[in-house]
């Protein structure tokens, strides 16, 4: 049995009685286009029109004016409110307009005509965060932080070396040149296709005396030397394999270079700089900080500090560049909205690829973050940690736009073009399937093997 219409309603908890007629307007937003001197025109559907609830109600009684004031206060309050209506039910609405009427013919009554609109909050396009731009901004900020702290500490070290030897600049140049020769030229000799790196390293060595006068410029040059260049999809996979080889080679060379050396802590160096600022003589500072060491051992310790600073700058820059290259590869893959026969297999094509590279770059960044923390280089530590968080967020958000990858185990031998059509409905992308799975002959995808197919 249908429920009885009571004739009672309320808005924001203020009660009223409905009158005979209640209205509801709606429809579509149709725009008509008519042109002069033409007999035809056209109409355009711009979407659904918002419903308009027309409520005719009243309050009655000896205190009807007080009741009317309460309802008016509710109607004029800001924001959405709850309308309870015997016909429309309970809905969240906003007040468009209202009209209150009093008549001498009907005493003890105030009538209202009210127009309500639905309270729809999310009716505008949502602002999407440009995570790729955030990575780009953090990338540059991180490199700047690394070079700033490196330059500051190298300057502090060189200030104490000046008090110990003649021509301290040449001693620093010798240490830095040996570092570049052992690390970059050694890597260029073992990894093919890195003649550009070798030439760049030689150029820096030839200008070291001038570069050490401006350590920030030296840091920039070393960062340029370690930079990865992913120039196109064709060579991106080779570049990333090369990066792994370079990183391993540099890490090994740096490990050998610093294995037998001890590093002066940053807190010790800061104490020395503070004492120097307070006009304490350098010789007195060194004697106080290194009581049990001879002068040559103190000099070696300061030079070793320079080597450790160079090592930390290079490894941190490598990790940052690797993350930037992965973000760029995702950008390239997301940009390929349509896949044709000419589409080239990119480095990162699926959510699975993204997850794999997230784990790899996170591991590399975490290693250099902890290394900087152990060395008390807090500026570099904070910048690297912020970069890591921004990069991880970017890869996770934009990685969701990429295709899913499924593994298919073949029970027979098929051509790649048939497999691609069977699992994606598009045979034009068979080259990508072959490249992704390293298929030597696309006509023979051998039975018993497992292939990864993008959907």
Swiss-Prot record:
One of its GO terms (biological process) is viral genome circularization. The keyword DNA-binding applies. Residues 368-387 bind DNA. It comes from the Bacteria. Pfam families: DNA_circ_N. InterPro entries: DNA_circ_N. GO terms for molecular function: DNA binding. Keywords: DNA-binding, Viral genome circularization, Virus entry into host cell. The keyword Secreted does not apply. To phage Mu protein N. This is Mu-like prophage FluMu DNA circularization protein. It comes from Haemophilus influenzae (strain ATCC 51907 / DSM 11121 / KW20 / Rd).
